[in-house]
Amino acid sequence: MNPPKITDIDEKIGSSCAELIRDGDCLQLGIGAMPDAILGFLTHKKDLGIHTEMFSDGVVDLVEAGVVTCARKNFHPGKMVATFFMGTEKLYKFVHNNPMVQMFPVNITNNPAIIAQNDNMVSINSTLQVALTLSLIHI
């Protein structure tokens, strides 16, 4: 599967959001161009962790750069925790028999009590719409 197309706007937002992520943070990643854009700006960070339902090629690049180590995670330290993967052949080759990758069902990866075991969790997601009037949008 081809990665989502990252636009100039995605890159500007991604650059700003990446400034909010600190060394040692544990990341939950959503689907789409925005999480991938943010990941591209994290190459100067240290000891990031991954505890997420899904991850993509951007995580592989950060592991290979030594940015993602999962060393500061409390739940399965040294391991990336995920339910599924979405990306290119490079991603699937990376996760195949990789001892750093641990697969769990969604009732583990998305369980608030388990997520809370990791310090400094940061969720990176996109949104489709926001109502500025604070009313609900029914789609």
Question: What is each of the regions a protein language model found here?
Answer:
Residues 137-139:
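Conserved small/polar residues in nucleotide/adenosyl-binding loops
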Residues 107:
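Active-site-adjacent helical/loop segments in soluble small-molecule enzymes
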Residues 1-104, 114, 129-133:
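Metallocofactor- and cofactor-centric catalytic cores in central/energy metabolism, strongly enriched
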Residues 125:
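Catalytic, metal-anchored helix/loop core of enzyme active sites in primary metabolism
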Residues 119-121:
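Short loop/turn motifs at secondary-structure junctions and domain boundaries
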